[in-house]
Curated annotation (Swiss-Prot):
<feature type="region of interest" description="Disordered">
    <location>
        <begin position="352"/>
        <end position="356"/>
    </location>
</feature>
<dbReference type="GO" id="GO:0070266">
    <property type="term" value="P:necroptotic process"/>
</dbReference>
<dbReference type="GO" id="GO:0042060">
    <property type="term" value="P:wound healing"/>
</dbReference>
<keyword id="KW-1003">Cell membrane</keyword>
<keyword id="KW-0963">Cytoplasm</keyword>
<keyword id="KW-0539">Nucleus</keyword>
<dbReference type="GO" id="GO:0048874">
    <property type="term" value="P:host-mediated regulation of intestinal microbiota composition"/>
</dbReference>
<feature type="repeat" description="LRR 2">
    <location>
        <begin position="727"/>
        <end position="747"/>
    </location>
</feature>
<dbReference type="GO" id="GO:0140738">
    <property type="term" value="C:NLRP6 inflammasome complex"/>
</dbReference>
<dbReference type="GO" id="GO:0003725">
    <property type="term" value="F:double-stranded RNA binding"/>
</dbReference>
<dbReference type="GO" id="GO:0140739">
    <property type="term" value="P:NLRP6 inflammasome complex assembly"/>
</dbReference>
<dbReference type="GO" id="GO:0005829">
    <property type="term" value="C:cytosol"/>
</dbReference>
<dbReference type="Pfam" id="PF17779">
    <property type="entry name" value="NOD2_WH"/>
</dbReference>
<keyword id="KW-1271">Inflammasome</keyword>
<dbReference type="InterPro" id="IPR041075">
    <property type="entry name" value="NOD1/2_WH"/>
</dbReference>
<dbReference type="GO" id="GO:0061702">
    <property type="term" value="C:canonical inflammasome complex"/>
</dbReference>
<dbReference type="GO" id="GO:0002862">
    <property type="term" value="P:negative regulation of inflammatory response to antigenic stimulus"/>
</dbReference>
Length: 892
């Protein structure tokens, strides 16, 4: 596009004056200053443009003045020269140039601003103009406080109907509408092409306009599209369409500028550096008729529909960037106008939106941070906060606890405690006279919830509420929502709990409540619930969790105090017997027997569980125990579990927190086995793979000592910390067919140094790095390490095995080493034999079953047996039994 002429008719004379002023200033410079000026000049220039060095290298003062005037134009050339003179240490000449410029041209300082300087002024204007927005109650608030970030998904993402009501879209499908996501909207594709039109679509009221204004604000704040967009303009389509008369695009731009001296022609001369935000484009009229013909000239006065239509169709400024907001049903109607748009769907809350909500609710930053931090640590509760109403409930409870000065870690550590606190807060806030009635209504509500859970019902008729005298009560208003459905003769009214989880919580609470102090068949009812929960795919899982959470001594006291009734201890004893019974008949886990030929294939992480697959039942039992937060009860419940075996669990942080708590409370002699489990969080896995690629690209080998110390805490860090607790009696840990990242090995190594009861460690068919083996060996060699038995199965040769063997010279407690199934090259066997004969080696038993050994290696081992007759070395060839064929060899 040709650059439009300057609006002033005196451009020619002003150019001559500028050339004269430039020459006068440059002639005052010495040769050294002029040389320095030329070098500084090639590094500066508005809008990222600078005069090519070839034109400057041999230019004298006359040539430089001409080049400046022709390349930049009158005012920009003078401003560039002034700044360059200052940088060339000719400040006196720069001051004289500025003074003569004002005298000769006679212009105000606002008009003297170049495009580059006006960018700063315009950004400041936008920041001031859009810093505050009005809420629906007309209260003015800061946009940074008002804006709630959204999830934005590409057009190809799964439809919203594919998700449950409380399910949050995965990060791969949708991204938060933060600056990173906004920047990605105009990201180049695989072929290097950048979209010029992006459409944000979504239903009414989801926040498209606010998001568009936040994009404009963030751009002005320097957070978005740096180096890409010089000017961004917000165009409210509805207002522009209703505005009478005709106006050009240049006029609309000028209306948004802080003054009438804006260099609009120069702005329009580089349309590729402009961003137009068209908000509410679905309000544009349909195509058709001459009045709807798109405008093609930015200086042509036309109707709002024609100007906006020209921008949408790219007939006007085809290289400019467009961000269009529209309702979800409207993009089809806009397709005829849009030119190769890229669409994105605006969705609801993201995880970080929850944090935003907490800070809005509390306002006091310190309290908000405390409340949010504890909720973030409870993954179950944090997931529920995807629903704004649940966020409100949680915040209400936490605010009450903070106002009372209570410790959140004690009163709000589980989902059960938070829900109970919310209900008791309702009772506490009621007048004393209304207390008994409210208690009775809550008991009836719990009974209704229980009947619904057991009968798999979520909808309740009005007559059911009337029978329980709940209709019109305060508890109905607080905990039930009303739905009106069109019926055949009249509207059908039904009620449902504000959240399914609340129904399940109240159902669990019903088992602990009594009527009039006379115990009901609570224990029998609990037995029915628990027997039902033991069935696969049970719908009673969450109710059972809540029940255990209510059985802690502290929760039971709260119930008695607020509900005015006695809670039967029989309920707790029934639940304890049920858990202990699960320990005797717990679903089995595949034994640690794997064909040696499988090798490291078995160390692959488990695939995503298919829908409908039975959940990991032992882990669910641990969740129930975790809810109690009562150490003695958990320890007593786990007495009937000789081992905790978890198979194919894709551990999340909440899973680890649950397991860690139960391990800390485990009784003496208990074992833990993790088989084919994923031991790294999804986001950590991505970071780890990136780190490996970077290490490979830099030619890095195994991790160095310094590198491993800088590793972040692993996903299993809380578990290993629990193992070091003085009250933890875990005696055996086995990790089988898992990938063990270096961070896991580092954290486990540190735990081995302090675990008070751990005497046996099994590392079977795991994928380990050389650095990982080294760190584990260091932990086993630590003087305070109490591990007596180590079982290692490494089907493939491992360079780090020498660290494990070398550890035998220092390990004070180790008496048994089982290397069955490992591949031991001859040099490794030679090294092993040398270590076994070291005076510091206290090993008593070495198992080499299913290990292929050369004749020389066998002879070396025989020599060790003769030198140390008390050392038991088991191998078929050493025991006089022939070595079985390779295809029959199997590891345990």
């Amino acid at each position: 596009m040709d650059q439009p002429e300057a609006p002033c008719s005196s451009t020619g004379p002003r150019l001559a004056v500028a050339r004269e002023l430039l020459l006068a200033a440059l002639e005052e410079l010495s040769q050294e200053q002029l040389k320095r000026f030329r070098h500084k000049l090639r590094d500066v220039g508005p809008d990222g443009r600078s005069i090519p060095w070839g034109r400057l290298e041999r230019a004298d003062a006359v040539d430089l003045a001409e080049q400046l005037a022709q390349f930049y134009g009158p005012e920009p050339a003078l401003e560039v020269a002034r700044k360059t003179l200052k940088r060339a240490d000719a400040r006196d000449v720069a001051a004289q140039l500025q003074e003569r410029r004002l005298q000769r041209l006679g212009l105000g300082s606002g008009t003297l601003l170049s495009v580059s300087e006006y960018k700063k002024k315009y950004r400041e204007h936008v920041l001031q103009l859009h810093a505050r927005v009005k809420e629906r109650n007309a209260r003015s608030v800061k946009i940074t406080k008002r804006f709630t970030k959204l999830l934005i998904a590409p057009e190809s993402a799964a439809p919203e109907e594919a998700m449950g009501p409380a399910e949050e879209p995965e990060p791969g499908r949708a991204r938060r509408s933060d600056t990173h996501t906004f920047n990605r909207l105009f990201r180049r594709d695989e072929e290097g092409r950048r979209p010029l039109t992006v459409v944000l679509q979504g239903p009414a009221g989801i926040g498209k306009t606010m998001a568009a204004k936040k994009i404009l604000y963030d751009w002005a704040a320097g957070k978005l599209y740096q180096g890409q967009v010089d000017f961004a303009f917000f165009m409210p389509c509805g207002e522009l369409l209703e505005r009478p008369g005709t106006r050009s695009l240049a006029d609309l731009i000028l209306d948004q500028c802080p003054d009438r001296g804006a260099p609009v022609p120069q702005m329009l001369a580089q349309p590729q550096r402009l961003l137009f935000i068209l908000d509410g484009a679905d309000e544009l009229p349909a195509l058709g008729g001459p009045e709807a013909a798109p405008c093609t000239d930015p200086f042509e006065a036309a109707s709002g529909a024609r100007v906006l239509g020209g921008l949408l169709s790219k007939a006007l400024l085809p290289t400019a960037l467009l961000l269009v907001t529209t309702r979800a049903a409207a993009p089809g109607r806009l397709q005829g106008r849009l030119c190769s748009p890229q669409c994105a769907e605006v969705r609801g809350f993201s995880d970080k939106d929850k944090k935003k909500y907490f800070y809005k609710y509390f306002r006091d930053e310190r309290r908000a941070e405390r409340a949010y931090r504890f909720v973030k640590e409870n993954e179950t509760l944090f997931a529920l906060c995807f629903v704004p109403f649940v966020c409100w409930i949680v915040c209400t409870v936490l605010r009450q606890q903070l106002e009372l000065g209570r410790d959140l870690s004690r009163t709000s550590k589980t989902t059960t405690s938070v829900y109970l606190l919310f209900i008791t807060s309702v009772l506490s806030s009621a007048p004393v006279a209304d207390g008994p009635r409210l208690q009775g209504d809550l008991r009836n509500l719990c009974r209704l919830a229980r009947e619904g859970v057991l009968g798999r019902r979520a909808q309740f008729a009005e007559k059911e509420l009337e029978q329980l005298e709940l209709r019109g009560s305060k508890v109905q208003t607080l905990f039930l929502s009303k739905k009106e459905l069109p019926g055949v003769l009249e509207t059908e009214v039904t009620y449902q709990f504000i959240d399914q989880s609340f129904q399940e919580f109240l159902a669990a609470l019903s088992y602990l409540l009594e009527d009039g102090g006379v115990p009901r068949t609570a224990a029998g009812g609990v037995g029915t619930l628990l027997r039902g929960d033991a069935q696969p795919h049970s719908h009673l899982v969450l109710t059972t969790r809540f029940l255990f959470g209510l059985l802690s001594a502290e929760r039971m006291r709260d119930i008695e105090r607020h509900f005015g009734c006695m809670v039967s201890e029989r309920v707790k004893q029934e639940a304890l017997r049920w858990v202990q019974g699960q320990g005797q008949g717990c679903p089995g886990v595949a034994p640690e027997v794997t064909e040696g030929a499988k090798g490291l294939e078995d160390t692959e992480e488990p695939e995503e569980e298919e829908e409908g697959e039975e959940p990991n039942y032992p882990l669910e039992l641990l969740y129930c125990l975790y809810e109690t937060q009562e150490d003695a009860f958990v320890r007593q419940a786990l007495c009937r579990f000789p081992e905790l075996a978890l198979q194919r669990v894709r551990f999340c942080r909440m899973d680890v927190a649950v397991l860690s708590y139960c391990v800390r409370c485990c009784p003496a002699g208990q074992a833990l086995r993790l088989i084919s489990c994923r031991l790294v969080a999804a986001q950590e896995k991505k970071k780890k793979s990136l780190g490996k690629r970077l290490q490979a690209s830099l030619g890095g080998g195994s991790s160095s000592q310094g590198t491993t110390k800088q590793l972040p805490a692993s996903l299993l860090h809380p578990l290993f910390q629990a193992m070091t607790d003085p009250l933890c009696h875990l005696s055996s840990l086995t990790l089988s067919h898992c990938k063990l990242p270096d961070a896991v090995c580092r954290d486990l190594s540190e735990a081995l140094r302090a675990a008070p009861a751990l005497t046996e460690l099994g590392l079977l068919h795991n994928r380990l790095s050389e650095a990982g083996l080294r760190m584990l060996s260091e932990g086993l060699a630590w003087p305070q390490c109490r591990v007596q038995t180590v079982r290692v199965q490494l089907p493939d040769p491992q360079r780090g095995l020498q660290y494990l063997v070398g550890m035998l010279r220092q390990s004070p407690a180790l008496t048994t080493l089982d290397l069955s199934g490992c591949q031991l090259p001859a040099p490794m066997v030679t090294y092993l034999c040398a270590v076994l004969q070291h005076q510091g080696c206290g090993l008593q038993t070495l198992s080499l079953a299913s290990v292929e050994l050369s004749e020389q290696s066998l002879q070396e081992l025989q020599a060790v047996k003769r030198a140390k007759p008390d050392l038991v070395i088991t191998h078929p060839a050493l025991d006089g039994h022939p070595q079985p064929p390779k295809e029959l060899i199997s590891t345990f």
